[in-house]
A protein has these predicted regions:
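Acidic-basic catalytic patches of nuclease active cores, encompassing PD-(D/E)XK
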Residues: 29-81
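Proline-centered loop/turn at the N-terminus of a beta-strand
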Residues: 56, 151-152
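Protease-associated
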Residues: 84-86
């Protein structure tokens, strides 16, 4: 019996060998500061949800969802995403990409910061393979909805200060409506997502921010430190006011004591015992 030699394709690269970029530029100066705000402010929430530290946050990192050649054609890179219940490091190394079929855990939420009108982020073009072997590049929306199945997908139009959030339900994305605060509840995290106008890293504009379920803004480290400084200053002022009140009370007591002593001295000069009131 003749054995036929079959050449197997090479193994798919691991996360340290896969391309870290598809060659496109970061689309605007807001993108990286925006990612920092989201990661910094959600940190305390994720630490409570994952006391073991098993979660990962990707910022403009590739999610490889199919094997292709070149590999980056089978990847999408959300501007920000969070994956629960996976280690932040792989074999002690910093993650450089996320290979979906090896992790077996989809991101809980993915966010895109659209510089334009968001058409690219809403592209639902399906993957198609032609008879000639050519493929049609699928749209992000289709990949997130039909393949990766990310439960929450947010599109923030930076230029228009507009936010849309979709929830994966019954195999399709349903567009959510904001609550009375104009926020979108992300129920598994116990937080809300919305737009906040303010200044960060010398840029005053609308930023994508988190709030807790009661509508309190989740602060970044710089804001938390500033709040602590304000609290410390208020405590210092309160202590100083208390010290001044105590000093004033002490002065009043001394003045009353001195007044009583002077009165007693005058009474004695008149021949009256100040203690009994009798004439000596």
């Amino acid at each position: 019996m003749t054995q036929t030699k079959i050449d197997l394709p090479p193994a798919f690269p691991d996360h340290t060998q896969l391309p870290e970029s598809d060659g496109t530029f970061v689309k605007n100066f807001q993108e990286h500061p925006q990612s920092i705000i989201l990661t910094d402010s959600i940190g305390p929430v994720l630490q409570q949800l994952h006391p073991d530290g098993d979660y990962a946050i990707g910022q403009d990192c590739g999610i490889y969802w199919r094997e292709t050649e070149p590999p980056e054609k089978g990847a999408e890179a959300p501007d920000w995403f969070y994956v629960p219940n996976v280690p932040p490091l792989l074999n002690g190394e910093i993650r450089r990409s996320y290979v979906l079929w090896r992790e077996l855990m989809a991101p809980m939420i993915a966010l895109e910061f659209a510089s334009g009108n968001g058409d690219e982020e809403r592209d639902a073009t399906p993957l198609s393979v032609w008879a000639e072997g050519e493929t049609t590049k699928p749209g992000k929306f289709w990949v997130y909805e039909r393949i990766i199945r990310i439960p929450y997908y947010g599109i923030c139009e930076v230029k228009n200060s507009k936010l849309e959030v979709y929830n994966w339900l019954n195999f399709y994305y349903q567009k959510l409506q904001p609550n009375e605060r104009g926020h979108y509840p992300i129920t598994p995290l116990g937080v809300e997502l919305g737009l906040w106008h303010g200044t960060y890293q010398n840029q005053t504009q609308y930023w994508l921010r988190w709030w807790d379920s009661e509508g309190n803004l989740l602060l970044i480290g710089e804001e938390r430190a500033q709040l602590e400084r304000q609290r410390a200053e208020q405590e210092r002022q309160r202590a100083e006011q208390e010290r001044q009140r105590a000093e004033q009370e002490h002065q009043r007591a001394e003045q009353a004591e001195q007044k009583a002593a002077r009165l007693a001295e005058r009474l004695r000069a008149m021949g009256i015992d100040p203690d009994s009131g009798q004439i000596e």
